[in-house]
A protein has these predicted regions:
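Glycine-rich, small-residue loops and helix-cap segments
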Residues: 96, 147, 187, 191, ...
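A short helix-breaking turn/cap at a secondary-structure junction
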Residues: 66-72, 269-362, 516-535, 553
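Sec-exported extracytoplasmic/periplasmic mature domains
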Residues: 91-95, 108-119, 134, 138, ...
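Acyltransferase
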Residues: 97-105, 134, 356-385, 405-415, ...
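Short, well-ordered alpha-helical
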Residues: 24-171, 201-204, 319, 524-562
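N-terminal secretory signal peptides
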Residues: 1-20
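Short helix-loop capping/hinge segments that flank enzyme active sites or metal/cofactor-binding pockets
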Residues: 77, 146-165, 341-350, 391-445, ...
């Protein structure tokens, strides 16, 4: 819908009833109590597959093929295809300046040179990627993802390719179909380069199932102690280290926003249900969110538009407002040469967000100053909702644990060794009572009600210091870079948005990235050490002779679990 006076498309948050999202969240909690989460091949993953071996039909989405999706590469990046954003690579492919196989090969060359250091992937599908690139070169053009190499977190089903979730439980599972999100990306022309490392069962930073640290932060590849973020660690390192154009992860408690902030990326956790969870190894029915990790707001918008939409295989995705024009939202708006906000926007600033003398606080203050200088952007102080610390604290946050333990109970009863280093949090979930879970669901609805009434009555988006509150209630978040520490480690921040209105925070980040260059910066390459190990799964890699990067204990994983 457009504004009758200006002809400008309205943001989705101006058209929606926020209370309807509250009612839907309550219904989702009730559905979760019935027990609707199913593990792949629950009777025995080594030999059993899901009873339904066909993925839902997915068709090409022409809405992605918009003029705003294409940008000619920057002069400084013209000579290196792996420096291009999706929109830049798409411009080059669309104008016949490069063919998909050349782009894929450029990334495979970097994987050959640097993957042994980064350890971003569980498996690299080099031959399949080159074959797909050649096929796309001879097919009708599909839009900005046509021929784009992508990294897929290893909890997304990939037909005929092991999907381990970095767990002993799934080490022999080979899905018979793709996850809906993977299918949607491939239908749009995306090319799967490989499956990426992750925290075991999507818990913490990427490690082997036994806790041995694998993936490093691309900005400090020789220092494995630098936090790379988790659990979508491998996807973040692959995109930041220029081993893939973009990638996808999942978030239950910061698993997209944390690695995005840690590695100078722009990542989106969309509204609950905006992207289908069908074909993803689950954690919780009410808090799992698939989403993209990308290099800038435009790329994140392209990826999310491809992934989003209703799916018959996931009731959470049905009956939602239509996906807004995210690509336009992520395109900076200019009046002549003057940048303006796409829509008049109030950015809510919570108490203490930029206080103190830390490098992070200084970067936050600089971010707020940049935004306040953009016409039609207003900074608004907003209070914490009533009982914020209680409602967002560990007591209620931990009620997610029994929900995720429930579908794993057959494994918990039979052999705890299959859970490896992540076993503690699964046992915690199994031991928490139903009363606590029900109380937690009531607390979640109260928290959501207060966020909608006491924060979003005064602002359109809100800055955050932690992803947890909006993870609990299922509201959208976007993480993006705002600076660097003195040691050269990225500093990021998070914006939270209103239900289904991913367009508004995307427009804010696009405006900010139009006046800053943090998102353009890339880490220096590590020393090239030759071809990566041939081990194709987490289980195989655990026996490979690689230098130790330390090991997380079960207690540490329980403390850090996402």
């Amino acid at each position: 819908m457009t504004d009758a006076s200006t002809g400008v498309q309205l943001p989705l948050d101006r058209l929606l009833d926020r209370r309807a999202f509250l009612a839907r969240t309550a219904a989702l909690a009730a559905t979760a109590a019935v027990g609707t989460v199913a593990l792949p091949g629950l009777a025995g993953l080594a030999s059993a597959a899901p009873s339904d071996t066909s993925a839902p039909a997915v068709t090409f989405n022409p809405d992605l093929d918009r003029g705003a999706a294409y940008n000619k590469p920057r002069e400084s990046a013209m000579s290196d295809p792996t420096e291009w954003t999706i929109s830049e690579a798409a411009w080059m492919i669309r104008h016949n300046k490069i063919v998909p196989v050349e782009l894929v090969q450029a990334y495979l060359d970097r994987i050959t040179a640097y993957e042994s250091t980064y350890q971003a992937f569980n498996v690299v599908l080099a031959e399949a990627a080159v074959k797909a690139a050649r096929q796309w070169a001879n097919r009708p053009y599909r839009g900005p993802l046509h021929g784009i190499p992508l990294a897929i977190k290893d909890n997304y089903f990939t037909e005929g390719v092991p999907t381990t979730a970095n767990s002993y439980l799934f080490q022999d599972f080979v899905p018979p179909y793709d996850a809906t999100s993977v299918t949607k990306l491939v239908v749009q022309g995306g090319i799967v380069l490989g499956k990426t490392q992750m925290g075991p069962l999507a818990t913490t930073r990427a490690t082997l199932p036994n806790g041995q640290v694998t993936t490093v932060n691309a900005w400090t590849p020789t220092n494995p102690s630098t936090n790379p973020g988790g659990s979508s660690t491998g996807t973040a390192t692959a995109v930041a280290g220029r081993l893939a154009s973009s990638g996808i992860g999942t978030q239950t408690g910061g698993s997209i926003t944390s690695p995005s902030n840690a590695q100078n990326l722009t990542g989106i956790k969309p509204t609950m249900g905006r992207v289908s969870l069908a074909g993803i190894v689950p954690l919780t029915y009410t808090r799992d969110h698939p989403g993209p990790l990308a290099r800038d707001a435009k790329d994140a918008a392209i990826m999310l538009m491809a992934m989003a939409g209703p799916d018959p295989a996931d009731p959470r995705s049905q009956g939602l407002p239509p996906v807004p024009n995210l690509i336009n939202a992520a395109t900076p708006r200019y009046d002549g040469d003057n940048l303006r906000m796409r829509w008049k926007t109030r950015i809510g600033v919570l108490p203490g967000y930029a206080d103190g003398g830390s490098e992070t606080a200084a970067a936050r203050r600089a971010f707020l100053a940049e935004m306040s200088a953009i016409p039609e952007c207003e900074l608004v102080e907003v209070p914490f909702p009533d009982e914020w610390s209680l409602l967002t604290g560990s007591a209620f946050n931990n009620v997610r644990l029994p929900e995720r333990s429930e579908p794993f109970m057959p494994y918990l009863r039979s052999d705890l060794r299959g859970f490896g280093v992540s076993v503690t949090s699964w046992l915690q979930g199994a031991l928490l009572g139903a009363n606590g879970w029900v109380t937690g669901q009531r607390a979640k609805l109260l928290l959501l009600d207060r966020i909608l009434d006491q924060i979003f009555s005064s602002c359109d988006v809100v800055v955050q210091t932690s992803p947890v509150p909006f993870d609990i209630v299922g509201l959208p978040e976007i993480a993006f870079p705002i600076g660097f520490s003195g040691g050269g480690v990225p500093i990021g921040t998070i914006l939270g948005g209103q239900p289904y209105a991913e367009d508004r925070p995307l427009s804010v980040v696009a405006a900010y990235q139009a006046v800053t260059d943090w998102h353009w910066r890339r880490p220096a390459d590590p020393p090239a050490v030759g071809p990566s190990p041939t081990a194709s799964t987490a289980a195989a890699r655990s026996t490979a002779a690689t230098p130790s990067r330390g090991r997380l204990t079960a207690e540490e994983v329980a403390e850090l679990t996402q």
